[in-house]
Curated annotation (Swiss-Prot):
SUPFAM superfamilies listed in its UniProt record: alpha/beta-Hydrolases
Membrane spanning stretches: 8-28, 97-117, 147-167, 210-230
Intracellular or extracellular location(s): Cell membrane
Pfam families: Hydrolase_4
Organism in which the protein naturally occurs: Mycobacterium tuberculosis (strain CDC 1551 / Oshkosh)
Official protein name in the record: Uncharacterized protein MT2364
Keywords, ordered alphabetically: Cell membrane, Membrane, Transmembrane, Transmembrane helix
Amino acid sequence: MSLKRCRALPVVAIVALVASGVITFIWSQQRRLIYFPSAGPVPSASSVLPAGRDVVVETQDGMRLGGWYFPHTSGGSGPAVLVCNGNAGDRSMRAELAVALHGLGLSVLLFDYRGYGGNPGRPSEQGLAADARAAQEWLSGQSDVDPARIAYFGESLGAAVAVGLAVQRPPAALVLRSPFTSLAEVGAVHYPWLPLRRLLLDHYPSIERIASVHAPVLVIAGGSDDIVPATLSERLVAAAAEPKRYVVVPGVGHNDPELLDGRVMLDAIRRFLTETAVLGQ
């Protein structure tokens, strides 16, 4: 063995040890890198809309989750929407969305997952799925809601939660804002050097589930989204069954207000829901 090769071996070993240490750290801390909850406190629902109510959704595993409920005002049982938030903040960051959806004539349930908005527990794929099921059950049980006219709205990671829920409990319509194909694929956009498929504890495989959703689907993407590129949203809608719609909001990024309560997005949602049992006559 040459002297040069002898000197190279320790360098290779050091690089391997460092890489192994980085991967081990990321594996052990991955949920802290995926979920960014706000601890609260969250303001009252009535500070958003006068008729808003602070509610508690209880999961099968005993979690008591805070939420906001904004009932429609048309009388009788009517259409509603269940909102599944993205991976950051809490429901107060979606107040404008709740107001906008309520303005379409919908009752709106906006809830926080476990670990978010002062709720107990820690977020995980399995936990968020349980939270969404509990929220859907709560909303379906309201006297002013027609269970056959409930839509799901999912934002980013919440879109993956909504897809999983829709497979188990089909809605009247499914609206996905900035959805990705899988957590591994969106992660690879930001960390292409990591073997994410092997590392991830949570997967959110929407691309494998979307074809099993038996409901009309609307996908909305930001044309300049550098967190969840529109190409991933486009691939997801391509895998969905008909009827489906795909809308790109040009020049808009992942967290821009145009994807919270912007006119293009809301017009697309209104037109879409009017074509379904949610708002259709």
